[in-house]
Structure formats: structure tokens, C-alpha cells
Swiss-Prot record:
Binding of Ca(2+) 3, residues: 94, 96, 98, 105
Organism, as annotated: Oryza sativa subsp. japonica (Rice)
Start and end residues of each EF-hand domain: 8-43, 44-79, 81-116, 117-149
Similarity remark: Belongs to the calmodulin family.
Pfam family, one: EF-hand_7
One cellular component (GO) term of this entry: cytoplasm
Protein name: Calmodulin-3
SUPFAM superfamilies per UniProt: EF-hand
UniProt gene name: CAM3
Residues noted as binding Ca(2+) 1 in the record, renumbered to the chain: 21, 23, 25, 27, 32
Residue positions where N6,N6,N6-trimethyllysine is found in the record: 116
Binding, Ca(2+) 4: 130, 132, 134, 136, 141
Amino acid sequence: MADQLTDDQIAEFKEAFSLFDKDGDGCITTKELGTVMRSLGQNPTEAELQDMINEVDADGNGTIDFPEFLNLMARKMKDTDSEEELKEAFRVFDKDQNGFISAAELRHVMTNLGEKLTDEEVEEMIREADVDGDGQINYDEFVKVMMAK
């Protein structure tokens, strides 16, 4: 399934994988998965985290390595309920629930994920997505960016 991904997608997933793989050992544990999910405002139980890992843990060793992670991401991209997932993701970024993602909100979420971005980098991310030029990202703009990945 991962063989349908472009080089760009694989590179992007490698970056995401390293955000999860806090200790850099090449595997994502339930603890690391939990840390990242909580930084995104989710609150999964230990059992839910284990289920998520078991879902993609092909070799049954209790952790997710990069090839397993790629398969998970390829599956997620094919999921038809991605509309709901996009809304959920948008809500994570849109802290004040005003229907827009501001530079401050974007910076906040990226910082929680351990990505220290300069003001310039945050502004650049907003500019790339901001079709109507109002300085923030609305839901339609967010969907365009997420679907273009």
C-alpha cells in the first residue's frame, strides 16, 4: 500500500515519524504516541493507544517502525471518512473556534508538537495556504492544503 506514495509524501511522513519518535530509536511506542496525541488536544487511554499500535504493528513487537507507519498513513489517506478527520484537525488548530487559524494558533500547535518555528516560517506557512489573502486560514483553505499533500 505504501508503494502508492510519492517521494514527497514519504519524506513528509518521515518528518512526521520523527516528531513521534521522541528518542530517535526508529520505533514509536505507546508512550510516544500518547505524548504526541495529547499535545494535539486528544486524550487517548492506554488501551486505545495500544489498539492504534496493534492496528499497524505488522511484526507484533508492540511498537511501530517506519515501514509500518507508512502503511498506516497510506491507509489513512485512502479512508473515506477523511472529511471528519479534516474537521477534527481544523478544530485542533482553531483554538478559539472562530472558524479561522491565525498565525498564533498555528505557532501554538507546532510548538506543542516540538517544532520550534520562527515568525517568518509561521508567516510563510500561512501565506502558502491563505488563498483569499486575509492573513489567516479558513476551513476551505485548510482542506486545500491538506488534500494537496
